[in-house]
Structure formats: structure tokens, C-alpha cells
Curated annotation (Swiss-Prot):
Subunit structure: Homodimer. Interacts (via F-BAR domain) with SNX9 (via SH3 domain). Interacts (via F-BAR domain) with SNX18 and SNX33. Interacts (via SH3 domain 1) with WASL. Interacts (via SH3 domain 2) with ITSN1.
Keywords for the protein's UniProt record, in alphabetical order: Cell projection, Coiled coil, Cytoplasm, Cytoplasmic vesicle, Lipid-binding, Phosphoprotein, Repeat, SH3 domain
Protein name (record): F-BAR and double SH3 domains protein 1
Record's GO cellular component terms: cell projection; cuticular plate; cytosol; neuromuscular junction; perikaryon; protein-containing complex; recycling endosome
MF terms in GO: lipid binding
GO BP term, example: response to hydrogen peroxide
Length: 690
């Protein structure tokens, strides 16, 4: 009689399977590295003997054809693989035998391409990613083993307590209390043992529930590893190999076609074979050969001892098991909403970084690539967490818990936030806001979202029209500065907007005195540069209301007489029109700081165009008094407050929404929004803002 098979721990079995996978993968990569090295060696020797004819080429191709890996019959059975393409090229070399002097340089360049070191670097990178994913799976299996061990211990303690309680009860029923115990003491002992048995039963129930939850989570993780992560990693390795093998093989084929007319048929066949190489088919055949990359059987629940319960139990009213499972549902639904937001935000950050990488210099490329890897790793962790959480929630729902009660609000809130970000993205893209600052803020938001699972709530700002900076602006509402970096403005004043603010609804501007600060954007009116506005000038000695234009001082100037203006560098000067038939003597007339005078025109730069004759101005025309902007400050929120309970649309299904292309940059506001004006200003009776 043969002994029963030895029992192997689940963690040890999974670990051995992973080690075997790594070993076979390294062997496969080594064969491909040898093939790449063969191609480089072939090109180097071909460049040296290209000037010779006939037998030299045959002697060159002979050693490569005699290699064990290339002369075996597996080349024909594997079909359209890189090995078959390589064999076809060698046959074309043997059949040809003609040389071309101009092909020598091309072979020499091909020999200096990427070699074994680059292939080993690709293998090392892919192996690290695979080992990281395998370590996470092993951790899940170890957690399952620990919970199963605890479950077995609790079951043994509970069974022992049951036996003791049953023994005392039997003695009590037989009145067999002996000489050392009375009936009263036996009754007390029976009561005590019954209480202990009930307590151990609750502990057994909690341990069994934890075991079941870890069981479904581990199975889901294993399935995700074999269905998603492992094929993705292997596909990445194959794509890297294709970049190193496709170009050399294609170059060899083209060189043969151009070098000799007599071997045109053989060279053309080699080119077709190379272009028809199916990397997906090669990968599929490789996965079918070893047999170790097939998914492992799912883990099954193994009851301990005499316990035959294999489902979640959440007990009656008042039992600790009920509150524990409900808390578990709340935690899992919150985690599901967080994973959903992390994945959507992560894909948006990936798109931004990909655009930035295409335009980045060689010095910035490594840092951007590192950021891309970090974001991809965060998205992958969120996907794994989502798969495990979905399995747990499905089991909890099957046990009778109302999962929809917490899941729908959580997912609805997450989708609302994603929709808000999509609208913000459309507003940003309409302004072509693709600056590195916006991308850095996007990445910072993603990192904070990954750590806390919370996104800052802010109202979607109104999309602003694209305008070139700096540009002039007319103040239509007064504003008193509330911070040191803000600027106090008065109604009717002209400003120069020099840059966007550090938050929405704020811009940085410079007044006529050269002072710079942040002002509310909705308190300003940006005139059309092609249609200059007209304004009143109370200091005009002629009594007419000329059309006002702006000019910015390029240099500071001190007036040489009482008629001349003095102004600092950067000041905004309002130009007054000259006579229609006047001669430009190099001095313009303008107003600055409440004074009217002349100044050299070479010291300023026009902002609104040349001043026109007096007949073009309308004395009755003035800037209209606009109505207050439709704005209501957002309700105060705190980043410490968690997001409201999300909602999942749909019926009773527990599937999560797909990841949409909602690419929306979000800039975290650094200052509160400006207060709204109470009403439109009255030119005759100005009131302060409230």
C-alpha cells in the first residue's frame, strides 16, 4: 500500500510555480538574446567580407546554419517566428554570393546596433515587474494560510469546550457528582462551560468569516494575475524584443535585395518572412509549450474538523459578527470608489505625461519615464485592489448583506467627481493649457488622491477666452486688497494684466503706478483690441471728451518742464488724441496719475493702437456699467472631510464602471474666490462693495 501523497502548503506550491515560470522565461529570453547576438556578429563579419565574392559568403553563412537551434526541425513547425525569418535570410545569403561595395557601410552600421546588453536590460526590467506581481500574489496566499490556520485553532478550541460542556451536562443528568462535587457545583460548572462554548463559537464564526473573505480575495487575485498581469508583462517583453529584432532583419533583407539581382527571389522571400513575423503567435506558442503559465486551479474552502459551514454568517441581532461584516462592507465600498477615482485620474495623468515626453529634451526624458512608471504602478495596484474588493463584496451580498446600500452612493459620488473633472478638462483644452505647471499640479493631485482617496471639491470655473498676455483691462468694480500679494483697484481704472493668477478667477495685474498684485478677474473688462473703447477725461483742457488709449512706459522719465509728464518704468499712460492735421513732433499728450502733459513717444509702447483725431471720438460715449458677474462663492469645504457616500448606477449588479477618457487637469486653488459685488456700480453715486 502506497503512502498518501504529502500535503504541500498553498503558499509553497504557488511559490514553486512562480520560480518555475521565472526560470523558463529567462531561458526563453536567453535564446532570443543569443539570436540577437548572432545577428550582430553576422552583420559585422558581412561588412568585412562584403568586397569578396561567392565562397566567402557561403563560408560565412555556414556556421550559423549549423547551429543547433537553427538546424532543428522546430523552425518549420513554429511557423512565422523570428527564427524562421532568420533561417530564410541565411538561405538567401548562401544562394546569393554576390558582393556590393556600397553595401559594406550599411552592414557596418547594422553591426553597431543594439546588442546583448540592451536585451539583458529589457529582461531585467521585465523580470523585476514579474517578481513584484508574484510577490503580491504570494502575500495574498500567505494571508489566506494564516486565516485558515487561525480558523483551525478556533475550531479545535470550540470542539474541546463543547466536549467538556457535554460531559458535565451528562454527569449532571445522571446526578453523578461524586464525593468532591455537589449538584450545585456541577450546575455552576455546566453554566460556565456553556458560556465558554458560546464565546468560542462566536470566535470560530469570526475566524471562519475571515477565512472565507481571504479565500475569495486570493482566488480573485490569482485569476487577475494569470488573466491580466502575466500576459501584459510577457507582451511587453515581446514588444521590446520586436524593436531589437525587426529592424536588423528588415535591413538585412533590403540589403540583399539591393545587392544582387541574381538572388532577388531569395531575398524577397526573406523580406516577406520577416514582415510576416507574428509576435502574438510566437508568444501564444511559447505559452502553450511549457504548460506552467496556465492558470492554477482556484482555491477551495476546506472546512476544519467537524465544522461544515462554508458560507458567511453574520449572526442574529446584537451579535458582534453582524456589525463586523457591515463595517467590512462600508470599508470595501469606500475602497472601491477610491480605486475607481485613482484609475481615472491615473489615465488622465498618463496622457499628460505622454504628451510631455514627446516634447521633452533628452535630459528630462528619464524623469518623465520614471513618473510614467510610478503612475502605471499605482493604476495596477488600484486594479488589483478593485478585483479583490469586487470578489469580497459579491460574497458579502450572497450572504444577505445589503451591499447596494453603501455601494451605490459611493460610486455615484465618484462618477460625479469624474464628470466634473471632464468638464474642467474641456475648459482647459479650449485654452490649450498644456503647460508643465498644469501637468505638475495634475501629478500632485494624483499622488494625493492615491494616498488619501479624496479629491479636492471645487466649482467648475467658467472657461475664459484665449487672450495674449500682457493685455489691458478696465476696472468695472472696486476691490480692496485682503492680502499682501493682492492689489487694491478702483472703478474706472486701467490695468495691465501680465499673467494668469495662482488660482481660478484671479489674475496678476499692474496699475498705472507700477504696483503689481492679484485682482479678481470678474471685476475687470477686457476690451476688444480691434475696437478701442472711449472714456471721459475730466482734465482735458479743450473741454471735449477724447478717446482714450493706453501706452506702457518702457523707461522711467522725469519731466523737464511743467508741461511734461513724469512716470516710472512700466507705468500705464492714457493717450489723448492729437489734432487731425497735427504734425508728430516726437511728443505725445497723455494722462498719468491725475496729471495731463506731454512726453517723448520713444519711451513708451502702445497697447491699444495709435490715437486718432478728435472727430473720431464720441463725446457722449462712455464705458457702460456692466451688471455684477453672476457668481456665488462656493460653500466652504475642508480637505480633511471625506467625500460623500458614492453611488453606483444600475440595478443589483456589482460591476464597476469602465474607465472613460476623462482627461481633465485640476489646479488646486491657493486662495479663496473673490467676493461678489452687491450690485452694479452707479456712476453718480458709487457705493462700496459689500
Amino acid at each position: 500500500m502506497q503512502p498518501p501523497p504529502r500535503k504541500v502548503k498553498p503558499a509553497q506550491e504557488v511559490k514553486l510555480r512562480f520560480l518555475e515560470q521565472l526560470s523558463i522565461l529567462q531561458t526563453w529570453q536567453q535564446r532570443e538574446a543569443d539570436l540577437l547576438e548572432d545577428i550582430r556578429s553576422y552583420s559585422k563579419q558581412r561588412a568585412a567580407i562584403e568586397r569578396e565574392y561567392g565562397q566567402a559568403l557561403q563560408k560565412l553563412a555556414g556556421p550559423f546554419l549549423k547551429r543547433e537551434g537553427h538546424r532543428s526541425g522546430e523552425m518549420d513547425s513554429r511557423g512565422r517566428t523570428v527564427f524562421g525569418a532568420w533561417r530564410c535570410l541565411l538561405d538567401a545569403t548562401v544562394a546569393g554570393g554576390q558582393t556590393r561595395l556600397q553595401a559594406s557601410d550599411r552592414y557596418r552600421d547594422l553591426a553597431g546596433g543594439t546588442g546583448r546588453s540592451a536585451k539583458e536590460q529589457v529582461l531585467r526590467k521585465g523580470t523585476e515587474n514579474l517578481q513584484r506581481a508574484q510577490a503580491e500574489v504570494l502575500q495574498s496566499v500567505r494571508e489566506l494560510s494564516r486565516s485558515r490556520k487561525l480558523y483551525g485553532q478556533r475550531e479545535r478550541v470550540w470542539a474541546l469546550a463543547q466536549e467538556k460542556a457535554a460531559d458535565v451536562q451528562a454527569r449532571l443528568n445522571r446526578s453523578d457528582h461524586g464525593i468532591f462535587h455537589s449538584r450545585t457545583s456541577l450546575q455552576k460548572l455546566s453554566t460556565k462551560l456553556s458560556a465558554q462554548s458560546a464565546q468560542y463559537s462566536q470566535q470560530l464564526q469570526a475566524a471562519r468569516n475571515e477565512y472565507l473573505l481571504n479565500l475569495v480575495a486570493t482566488n480573485a487575485h490569482l485569476d487577475h494575475y494569470y488573466q491580466e498581469e502575466l500576459p501584459a508583462l510577457l507582451k511587453a517583453l515581446v514588444s521590446e524584443l520586436s524593436e531589437h529584432l525587426r529592424d536588423p532583419l528588415t535591413s538585412l533583407s533590403h540589403t540583399e535585395l539591393e545587392a544582387a539581382e541574381v538572388i532577388l527571389e531569395h531575398a524577397h522571400r526573406g523580406e516577406q518572412t520577416t514582415s510576416q513575423v507574428s509576435w502574438e503567435q510566437d508568444l501564444k506558442l511559447f505559452l502553450q509549450e511549457p504548460g506552467v503559465f496556465s492558470p492554477t486551479p482556484p482555491q477551495q474552502f476546506q472546512p476544519a474538523g467537524t465544522d461544515q459551514v462554508c458560507v458567511l454568517e453574520w449572526g442574529a441581532e446584537g451579535v458582534a459578527g453582524k456589525s463586523g461584516l457591515e463595517k467590512e462592507v462600508q470599508r470595501l465600498t469606500s475602497r472601491a470608489a477610491r480605486d475607481y477615482k485613482i484609475q481615472n485620474h491615473g489615465h488622465r495623468v498618463l496622457q499628460r505625461l505622454e504628451q510631455r515626453r514627446q516634447q521633452a529634451s533628452e535630459r528630462e526624458a528619464p524623469s518623465i519615464e520614471q513618473r510614467l512608471q510610478e503612475v502605471r504602478e499605482s493604476i495596477r495596484r488600484a486594479q488589483v485592489s478593485q478585483v479583490k474588493g469586487a470578489a469580497r463584496l459579491a460574497l458579502l451580498q450572497g450572504a444577505g448583506l445589503d451591499v447596494e446600500r453603501w455601494l451605490k452612493p459611493a460610486m455615484t459620488q465618484a462618477q460625479d467627481e469624474v464628470e466634473q473633472e471632464r468638464r474642467l478638462s474641456e475648459a482647459r483644452l479650449s485654452q490649450r493649457d498644456l503647460s508643465p505647471t498644469a501637468e505638475d499640479a495634475e501629478l500632485s493631485d494624483f499622488e494625493e488622491c492615491e494616498e488619501t482617496g479624496e479629491l479636492f471639491e471645487e466649482p467648475a470655473p467658467q472657461a475664459l477666452a484665449t487672450r495674449a498676455l500682457p493685455c489691458p483691462a478696465h476696472v468695472v468694480f472696486r476691490y480692496q486688497a485682503g492680502r499682501e500679494d493682492e492689489l487694491t483697484i478702483t472703478e474706472g481704472e486701467w490695468l495691465e494684466v501680465i499673467e494668469e493668477g495662482d488660482a481660478d478667477e484671479w489674475v496678476k495685474a499692474r496699475n498705472q503706478h507700477g504696483e503689481v498684485g492679484f485682482v479678481p478677474e470678474r471685476y475687470l473688462n477686457f476690451p476688444d483690441l480691434s475696437l478701442p473703447e472711449s472714456s471721459q477725461d475730466s482734465d482735458n483742457p479743450c473741454g471735449a471728451e477724447p478717446t482714450a488709449f493706453l501706452a506702457q512706459a518702457l523707461y522711467s522719465y522725469t519731466g523737464q518742464s511743467a508741461e511734461e509728464l513724469s512716470f516710472p518704468e512700466g507705468a500705464l499712460i492714457r493717450l489723448l488724441p492729437r489734432a487731425q492735421d497735427g504734425v508728430d513732433d516726437g511728443f505725445w499728450r497723455g494722462e498719468f496719475g491725475g496729471r495731463v502733459g506731454v512726453f517723448p513717444s520713444l519711451l513708451v509702447e502702445e497697447l491699444l493702437g495709435p490715437p486718432g483725431p478728435p472727430e473720431l471720438s464720441d463725446p457722449e460715449q462712455m464705458l457702460p456699467s456692466p451688471s455684477p458677474p453672476s457668481f456665488s462663492p462656493p460653500a466652504p469645504t475642508s480637505v480633511l472631510d471625506g467625500p460623500p457616500a458614492p453611488v453606483l448606477p444600475g440595478d443589483k449588479a456589482l460591476d464597476f464602471p469602465g474607465f472613460l477618457d476623462m482627461m481633465a487637469p485640476r489646479l488646486r486653488p491657493m486662495r479663496p474666490p473673490p467676493p461678489p459685488p452687491a450690485k452694479a456700480p452707479d456712476p453718480g453715486h458709487p457705493d462700496p462693495l459689500t
